[in-house]
């Protein structure tokens, strides 16, 4: 009797061992293994006990036992294979025999050949077996196999005991010292057995994969196409009709318990839902002797559930492929509560009908079509672990002579479906993961397509529609694009304009539905029909859109921003008062329509799917997938529109640059005039001096001075700069400076002259190449091009276009870009004669030098420069060191106004302060914020103090280290020290109430005294007896407890709000200056003691000595000393002494 053939989840891991077709079955001995392990692992063998003979039928994946003779076509390894393979098999036996009884370890396993004509991929059913040996294996062969295994184990044990630790260390030392020799021995002389054992050791040390369904089966399933999956051994249940009776007769020899367990194992690990359902119906037929069966799966939403026939009328002879094809061709949908299966699904109760035609719920239409008569029906629900209905199984007519299903059949059916419910839910989850994986792959491909098709909107939308149609299996797909006024010039800026968060959140309640419809007017329509139809792109008119029902539905979605899933189009049109177009509605069954939005959540289009291929409505799952498509579609369309508009903006920018270049370039008349001018010598402009000033130079002289610097550095002839090009470039640079108060062309000239003086007078040209000198002079002249009078912080706060364009060193990057723009303008390229390598080098120098004028860059580089100087660095020719040196020189030149003579420095400081105050006013006006002290006009009196801080933090440390390293630039350091003393003096005077900033010069710092100069002050006597009198001598009743605001004194009177008043101080100022000039005062002044008696520093120590004054003021103090009351005098403070010296 031949062994039966059935389906098994592990059949794909089995190897057929068969004799020629038509021959008798000859069992062949296979590799021994544990039967318990075979029943628990999908990759292990599954033995079957065949009736009373108890013959063990099993397989082991990968081969046969040593000495076994494989049949023709076998995939097993013959006994005459290499010794390496033999060692692998023996090692496998040793692993399987560990910690197990000898009788169990030597239970033989065999596999019978399938009957003639049976498919090689057919699955086999296996049940637990005894431990009897196969009759085809002789006792001598079995004994030889056991002896071979024993000898292998003894040899390994002996090797482990004889090898000492010293031997192991010696071998390890040889391997470490001569790895090449060991590798050569392995490749040339190592025996195969040693190589095989080495491979085993390596494999055993590898980490094992986690035993998971997704680790093997899922990846296998993903790699296979649907065709391959249907033809794979584990998925095929469509064996020939002639084999099924054989299988049935064999299983009938099993007792009920063994058969039940075997059929449970048959479906336990099956993940293909089609194969699983086919196995369930076939196995249920075996258990209950039913003629045929059907299986329905629950679908739909919680409020609208229905059953779908997965497989219908499956008999023992129905092949899987035929069953699946028939179910797909004639999809049967049964709502819950309708018919026998629907009633079972709704009530979760079993129905056992003995006579079907007498039951009102029975539908005889199928019998009429097929000619088959249904007598008995047993229908039972399939539930998951939570008790929810996931399907219904139905069997029809018994075949063993009984006319109805008894209680025993019901119990067997119920018990078996309990296990089947677990398998079905697992298979459904696996199918969902497979679908999700495929969807993700499609979405990834879609994302890839989006990035590939950035420059063509039509190709992009066509790709998106094709992917959506293939994934969701719909008949047609359409995309409507909303009119974005792309032709308007203002829209080009709107596309890239940073969105206003408040504006995007604001909702205008006054907008009506019709107004929104007008804004969301469609201009482009993309349509994609069947599989072999090309996409159609059109621009429908308003009348065409208003007469199309599909367009009206899309218009509704675009206006409301809602997703609509329409099952009945006619009813939806009637409910929403839309115009019905008969030509479209008649062929439309279901519509899924969704808005397409951009990054600002603005509707830019509508995607529409029409009619699913199987005629059913679109599900929530379809809507979720389509939502992902809509998101990708929105990103793709938005990006493509951005790209198209960016191209337009680039074209627009080129036009603007052409216009800017024309207007930024100096005129031909100016160029010719400067070319013909005579350039004076450098000494006449005082170019070699660090005390250079441009105050006496007219604008044309400034350009001539720049030309002289280029000539003196021999740059014109060295780099073959055409003279007219150089003149035009200088004039163009001057033209591109804005007329701000400080950062203008004059400032650029002073910075360039300081660099020239450092190179020539300071002898820094010794450390520079001619190309670097050219780059530094160009950088100095261009380092503040197009300066707007505001700093980088202001650009960032106001979120100006420059701050968006450049995130760091905003203005410096803009200055460099303007420099490049001028050089690229026609007739302005002074680098035109340079080689490409020299051009790159000089442009790199210019860029680095201009960016170094940002004080933030200075602070980053200063520590590295100080470290080099402190280490005694004298070689500055390295690239990094040269870059640091040039950066420090640029900063030194940029702030060099602080080292100019005092009569120049205080005027420049006034210009800087005015520009800063203008920025502070803008911050108050535009940002509604309080500016910092240096930019706050209301704190202008603090400027001297801030100047001292600026010198101490930035200027003096820089000039000191440069002076220590390069002593020829000492004048910069000395001039800075001198100006610091002047600013410190002014700061102390401001603390005493003197201000200066409202004057163009600082010649008359006591400016408040001139406020009421026009008023005639009469009869005011002012006699200066002393500037420091004892408080108690004048006011004996006042002591230290007297409130300060009640005390009178000269300090209060000297302040702007003092008791003396502006008129008195104006007269005082005139008198003091007239006295200094030697002229006689017009009015005899006497300073009342009540206004000047208070000491300016209450904590000053007393002294019996009286201070002396010089000049006429000293004489005034001496002559008036007799009018004092003789009170005790105190010493003057330091500040009082300075005030006396001023007076």
Curated annotation (Swiss-Prot):
A lipid is attached at residue 1140 (S-farnesyl cysteine). This is cGMP-specific 3',5'-cyclic phosphodiesterase. Keywords: Cell membrane, cGMP, Hydrolase, Lipoprotein, Membrane, Metal-binding, Methylation, Prenylation, Repeat. Its cofactor is a divalent metal cation. It is a lipid-anchor. Residues 272-424, 456-637 form the GAF domain. PANTHER family: CYCLIC NUCLEOTIDE PHOSPHODIESTERASE. GO terms for cellular component: membrane; plasma membrane. It catalyses: 3',5'-cyclic GMP + H2O = GMP + H(+). Coiled coil: none annotated. InterPro entries: GAF (IPR003018), GAF-like_dom_sf (IPR029016), HD/PDEase_dom (IPR003607), PDEase (IPR023088), PDEase_catalytic_dom (IPR002073), PDEase_catalytic_dom_sf (IPR036971), PDEase_CS (IPR023174). It is an enzyme of class 3 (hydrolase). Residues 46-59, 96-107 have a biased composition (Polar residues). Interacts with PrBP. The modification Cysteine methyl ester is found at residue 1140.
């Amino acid at each position: 009797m031949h062994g039966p053939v059935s389906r098994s989840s592990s059949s794909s891991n089995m190897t057929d061992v068969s004799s020629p077709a038509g021959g008798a079955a000859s069992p062949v001995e296979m590799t021994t293994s544990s039967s318990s392990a075979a029943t628990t692992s999908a990759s292990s063998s599954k033995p079957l006990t065949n009736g009373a003979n108890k013959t063990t039928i099993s397989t082991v994946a990968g081969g046969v036992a040593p000495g076994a003779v494989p049949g023709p076509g076998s995939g097993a390894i013959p006994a005459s294979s290499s010794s390496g393979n033999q060692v692998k098999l023996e090692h496998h036996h040793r692993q399987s025999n560990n910690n197990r009884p000898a009788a169990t370890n030597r239970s033989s396993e065999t596999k019978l050949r399938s009957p003639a004509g049976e498919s090689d991929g057919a699955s086999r059913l296996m049940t637990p077996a005894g431990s009897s040996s196969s009759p085809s294996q002789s006792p001598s062969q079995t004994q030889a196999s056991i002896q071979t295994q024993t000898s292998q184990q003894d040899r390994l044990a002996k090797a482990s005991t004889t090898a000492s630790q010293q031997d192991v260390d010696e071998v390890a030392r040889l391997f470490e010292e001569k790895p090449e020799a060991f590798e050569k021995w392995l490749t040339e002389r190592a025996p195969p057995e040693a190589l095989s054992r080495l491979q085993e050791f390596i494999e055993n040390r590898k980490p094992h994969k986690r035993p998971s369904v997704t680790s093997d089966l899922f990846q296998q399933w993903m790699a296979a196409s649907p065709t391959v999956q249907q033809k794979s051994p584990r998925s095929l249940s469509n064996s020939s009709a002639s084999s099924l009776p054989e299988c049935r007769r064999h299983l009938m020899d099993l007792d009920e318990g063994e058969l039940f367990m075997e059929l449970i194992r048959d479906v336990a690990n099956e993940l293909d839902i089609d194969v699983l359902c086919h196995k369930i119906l076939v196995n249920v037929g075996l258990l209950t002797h039913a003629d045929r069966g059907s299986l329905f799966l629950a679908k739909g939403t919680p409020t609208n559930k229905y059953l779908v026939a997965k497989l219908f009328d499956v008999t023992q002879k129905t092949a899987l492929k035929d069953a699946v094809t028939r179910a797909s061709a004639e999809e049967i949908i049964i709502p819950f509560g309708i018919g026998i299966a629907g009633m079972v699904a709704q009530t979760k109760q079993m129905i056992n009908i003995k006579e079907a035609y007498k039951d009102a719920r029975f539908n005889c239409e199928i019998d009429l079509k097929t000619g088959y008569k249904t007598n008995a029906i047993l229908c039972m629900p399939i539930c998951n672990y939570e008790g929810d209905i996931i399907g219904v199984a139905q069997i029809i007519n018994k075949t063993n002579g009984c006319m109805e299903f008894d209680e025993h059949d019901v119990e067997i059916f119920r018990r078996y479906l309990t296990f089947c419910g677990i398998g079905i839910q697992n298979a459904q989850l696996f199918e969902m993961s497979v679908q999700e994986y495929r969807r993700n792959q499609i979405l990834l491909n879609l994302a890839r397509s989006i990035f590939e098709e950035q420059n063509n909107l039509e190709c992009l939308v066509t790709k998106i529609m094709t992917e959506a149609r293939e994934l969701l299996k719909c008949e047609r797909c359409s995309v409507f694009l909303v009119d974005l006024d792309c032709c308007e010039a203002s829209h080009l800026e709107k596309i890239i304009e940073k969105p206003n968060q408040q504006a995007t959140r604001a909702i205008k309640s006054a907008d009506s539905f019709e107004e929104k419809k007008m804004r969301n007017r469609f201009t482009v329509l993309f349509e994609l029909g069947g599989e072999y139809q090309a996409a159609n792109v059109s621009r429908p008119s308003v009348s065409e859109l208003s007469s199309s029902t599909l367009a009206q539905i899309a218009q509704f979605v675009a206006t409301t921003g809602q997703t609509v899933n329409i099952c009945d189009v006619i009813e939806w049109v009637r409910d929403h008062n839309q115009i019905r177009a008969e030509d479209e509605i008649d062929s439309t069954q279901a519509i899924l329509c969704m808005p397409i939005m951009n990054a600002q959540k603005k509707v830019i289009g509508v995607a529409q799917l029409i009619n699913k291929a199987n005629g059913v409505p679109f599900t929530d799952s379809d809507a979720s997938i389509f939502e992902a498509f809509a998101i990708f579609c929105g990103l793709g369309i938005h990006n493509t529109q951005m790209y198209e508009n960016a191209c337009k903006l680039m074209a627009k920018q080129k036009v603007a640059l052409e216009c800017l270049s024309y207007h930024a370039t100096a005129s031909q008349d100016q160029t010719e005039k400067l070319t013909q001018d005579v350039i004076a010598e450098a000494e006449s402009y005082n170019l070699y001096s660090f005390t250079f000033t441009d105050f006496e130079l007219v604008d044309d002289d400034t350009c001539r001075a720049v030309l002289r610097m280029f000539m003196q550095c021999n740059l014109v002839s060295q780099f073959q700069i055409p003279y007219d090009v150089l003149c035009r470039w200088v004039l163009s640079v001057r033209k591109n400076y804005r007329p701000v108060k400080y950062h203008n062309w004059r400032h650029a000239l002073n910075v360039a002259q300081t660099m020239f003086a450092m190179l020539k007078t300071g002898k820094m040209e010794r450390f520079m190449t001619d190309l670097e000198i050219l780059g530094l002079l160009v950088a100095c002249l261009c380092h503040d091009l197009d300066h707007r009078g505001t700093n980088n912080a202001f650009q960032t706060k106001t979120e100006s276009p420059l701050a968006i364009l450049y995130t760091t060193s905003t203005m410096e990057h803009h200055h460099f870009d303007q420099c490049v723009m001028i050089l690229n303008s026609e007739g302005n390229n002074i680098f035109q004669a340079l080689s490409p390598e020299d051009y790159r080098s000089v442009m790199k120098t210019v860029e680095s030098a201009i960016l170094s004028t940002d004080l933030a860059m200075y602070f980053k580089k200063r520590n590295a420069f100080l470290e080099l100087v402190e280490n005694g660095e004298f070689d500055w020719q390295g690239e990094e060191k040269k870059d640091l040196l040039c950066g420090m020189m640029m900063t030194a030149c940029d702030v060099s106004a602080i080292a100019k003579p005092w009569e120049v420095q205080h005027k420049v400081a006034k210009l800087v302060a005015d520009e800063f105050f203008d920025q502070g006013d803008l911050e108050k006006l535009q940002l509604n914020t309080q500016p910092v002290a240096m930019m706050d006009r209301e704190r202008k009196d603090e400027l001297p103090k801030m100047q001292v801080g600026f010198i101490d933090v930035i200027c003096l440390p820089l000039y000191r280290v440069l002076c220590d390293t390069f002593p020829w630039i000492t004048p910069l350091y000395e001039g800075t020290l001198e100006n610091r003393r002047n600013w410190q003096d002014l700061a102390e005077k401001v603390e005493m109430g003197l201000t200066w900033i409202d004057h163009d010069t600082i010649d008359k710092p006591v400016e408040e005294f001139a406020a009421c100069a026009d008023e005639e002050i009469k009869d005011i006597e002012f006699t200066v007896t002393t500037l420091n009198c004892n408080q108690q001598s004048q006011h004996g009743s006042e002591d230290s407890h007297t409130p300060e605001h009640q005390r009178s004194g000269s300090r209060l009177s000297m302040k702007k709000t003092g008791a003396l008043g502006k008129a008195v101080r104006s007269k005082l100022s005139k008198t003091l200056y007239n006295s200094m000039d030697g002229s006689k005062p017009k009015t005899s002044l006497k300073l009342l003691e009540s206004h000047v008696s208070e000491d300016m520093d209450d904590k000053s120590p007393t002294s019996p000595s009286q201070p002396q004054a010089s000049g006429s003021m000293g004489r005034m103090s001496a002559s008036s000393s007799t009018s004092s009351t003789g009170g005790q005098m105190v010493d003057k403070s330091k500040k009082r002494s300075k005030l006396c010296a001023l007076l």
